């Protein structure tokens, strides 16, 4: 079931890296069945190798406490039986991040991912390559090419099927153009839960059935259910979304009735939602999940009225490739083997054809991408339930440039990391901000309304029912301090809000800066311009002091760094 302990012989980051350079066995993975899937998700348009720090806070509550994906650091290693100070422990956790990153180098990059895909397909020539979505957004080149860079890269990579989320922020017209023209006859764009608002017609194919080694296999797509809530509704005005368990059951029953012996779902629900769906819908063999960026080494086996379903999640940023082998005998799955392989750029040579495409894509923008803006003296990262240091930088820039007392920055999970001592380039800033609605805003808000905003976002993150978790991580906050009780009741999780040590007055008005408004017609200076202005004025960026809330009731949670 596990990705294995292939690097267990390593005793330190340095010795592990030296052994890896000599050719360790991480990627020696013989086929273990007759139906295979390769899965990546949430690459967020990262074509070149990057640094990416995994979260130190990923809190699970209620039934989600103490089960994947809500483990971090040492608790993660303990639960998943991953040896410390190894390639795998670096890939899966934040532990000693900078030290390990310098030892192992960058991760991901489509040229290195392509090499790994080809290596896995050499032993699995008919394996399906699944793309879990959030592929066409997240970088400067994806924004500037309207997603074309990633469309071309995915075609060359050999993707067979995908399901969407951030793709919809390019707008319905652009999505349909890509599906109907670029993907025609090449990549299946699947979403059983996207329908027209007028008659409820299916907008995209809900599934495909294809044979692999003579065995009929159904692949069903599940788009992010809350796209019109988490992202601008006006970009997809004529389509409805939602989880749609009942429709999923109908689709599963339909493909089974058509003879499918293996049924899998490419899902962008998020792992907690997938776990609940797996407990309710019968007949799914595996859910290949995304959205929550959880690199989970082993599948979770979930019981339901019809049997059992495997649930996986394959991380983000082209940092991982999931490999699932099913051994199908007499029309049933007799056994399976799953591995979540980290993509270390120093261990996998760049595929020449993919590298040539990437070079071609980036060439017109290279000077613009690499323009130096400042040097950071501390590690910059985003991922985690609460403020990351790059988010703190964005909040600090918003408050100073816009003259605001308080700043809010969205709790996006995407965004690469920058090591201390590195030059911050325009590309790094775009990695944090490249969206189609980048407008900054300055709004007068009462203390009462500020609390309402924080409570609403907090409920989206920590609602005890996964089906009501409708967004990303907690909104990032600058200037304002507060306490948060994740396990509290709706409307009562936020307390002790203060500005410069003084309690927030519910009736008083405060000047609040933010960005990424979802309302139609919003305008304002793009966030990347604000951040660039601030960085250039500073030249050297001192380590950011994280404005983290005082957390209540989660002291022993395995999703909290010790």
Regions found by a protein language model. Give the residues of each.
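Charged/polar, solvent-exposed surface patches and flexible loops
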Residues: 115, 119-122, 177, 181, ...
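Acidic, metal/ion-coordinating pockets
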Residues: 4, 8-345, 385-397, 461-463, ...
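General structural signal for secondary-structure boundaries
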Residues: 169-174, 181, 240, 270, ...
């Amino acid at each position: 079931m596990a990705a294995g302990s292939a690097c267990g012989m390593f005793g330190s980051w340095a010795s592990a890296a030296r052994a890896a350079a000599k050719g360790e066995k991480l990627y020696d993975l013989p086929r273990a069945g007759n139906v295979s899937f390769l899965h990546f998700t949430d690459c967020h348009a990262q074509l070149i190798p990057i640094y990416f720090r995994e979260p130190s806070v990923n809190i699970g509550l209620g039934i989600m406490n103490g089960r994947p994906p809500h483990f971090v650091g040492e608790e993660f290693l303990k639960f998943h039986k991953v040896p410390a100070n190894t390639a795998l422990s670096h890939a899966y956790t934040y532990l000693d991040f900078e030290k390990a990153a310098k030892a192992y180098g960058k991760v991901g990059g489509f040229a290195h991912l392509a090499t790994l895909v080809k290596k896995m397909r050499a032993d699995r020539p008919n394996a399906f390559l699944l793309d879990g979505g959030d592929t066409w957004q997240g970088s400067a080149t994806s924004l500037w090419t309207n997603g074309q860079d990633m469309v071309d890269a995915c075609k060359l990579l050999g993707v067979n099927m995908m399901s969407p989320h951030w793709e919809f922020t390019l707008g319905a017209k652009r999505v349909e153009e890509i599906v109907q023209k670029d993907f025609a006859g090449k990549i299946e764009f699947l979403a059983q839960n996207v329908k027209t608002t007028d008659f409820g017609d299916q907008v995209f194919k809900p599934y495909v059935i294809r044979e692999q080694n003579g065995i009929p296999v159904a692949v069903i797509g599940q788009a992010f259910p809350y796209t019109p809530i988490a992202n601008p509704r006006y970009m997809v005005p004529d389509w409805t979304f939602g989880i749609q368990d009942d429709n999923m059951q109908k689709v599963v029953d339909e493909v089974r009735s058509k003879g499918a012996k293996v049924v899998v779902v490419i899902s962008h629900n998020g792992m907690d939602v997938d776990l609940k769906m797996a407990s309710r819908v019968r007949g799914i063999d595996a859910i290949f999940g995304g959205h929550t960026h959880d690199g989970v080494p082993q599948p979770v086996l979930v019981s339901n009225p019809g049997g059992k379903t495997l649930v996986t999640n394959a991380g983000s940023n082209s940092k991982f490739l999931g490999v699932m082998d099913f051994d199908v005998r007499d029309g049933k799955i007799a056994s399976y083997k799953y591995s979540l392989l980290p993509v270390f750029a120093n261990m996998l040579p760049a595929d020449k054809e993919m590298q040539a495409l990437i070079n071609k894509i980036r060439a017109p923008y290279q000077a613009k991408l690499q323009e130096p803006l400042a040097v950071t003296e501390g590690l910059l990262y985003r991922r985690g339930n609460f403020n990351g240091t790059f988010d703190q930088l964005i909040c600090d820039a918003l408050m100073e440039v816009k003259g605001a007392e308080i700043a809010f920055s969205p709790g996006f999970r995407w965004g690469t990391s920058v090591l201390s001592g590195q030059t911050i380039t325009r590309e790094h800033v775009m990695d944090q901000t490249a969206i189609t609605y980048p407008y900054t805003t300055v709004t007068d808000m009462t203390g009462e309304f500020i609390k309402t905003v924080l409570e609403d976002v907090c409920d989206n993150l920590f609602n005890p029912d996964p089906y009501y978790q409708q967004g990303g991580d907690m909104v990032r906050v600058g200037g304002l301090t507060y306490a948060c009780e994740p396990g509290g009741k709706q409307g009562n999780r936020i307390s002790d809000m203060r500005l410069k040590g003084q309690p927030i007055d519910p009736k008083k008005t405060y000047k609040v800066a933010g960005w990424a408004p979802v309302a139609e017609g919003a305008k304002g200076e793009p966030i990347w311009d604000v951040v660039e202005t601030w960085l250039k004025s500073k030249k050297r960026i001192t380590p950011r002091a994280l404005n983290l809330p005082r957390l209540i009731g989660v002291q022993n949670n395995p999703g909290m760094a010790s």
